[in-house]
From Swiss-Prot:
Signal peptide: none annotated. It holds the Pfam family YidD. Could be involved in insertion of integral membrane proteins into the membrane. The lineage of its organism: Bacteria, Bacillati, Bacillota, Bacilli, Lactobacillales. This is Putative membrane protein insertion efficiency factor.
Amino acid sequence: MRKILIALVRFYQTGISPFLPPSCRYYPTCSSYMIQAIQKHGAIKGLAMGIGRILRCHPFIKGGYDPVPDHFTVFRNKSVDH
């Protein structure tokens, strides 16, 4: 399941994203965050974390550095100095 989800995100990164204007407000990008979350927390939790990140990424927020946390959460990583 992990490999399938990561392959789908990689397809987005190489086949779709290059044709869209840059819009992610965070580092790492939402797609990279999703891959890292899946690798670190597994398919279900990683997918939930990635979807949560995508929902947080919009023009009305500051964005910034938001790495995948060591523990499962769908909220922004509060342990990082922003």
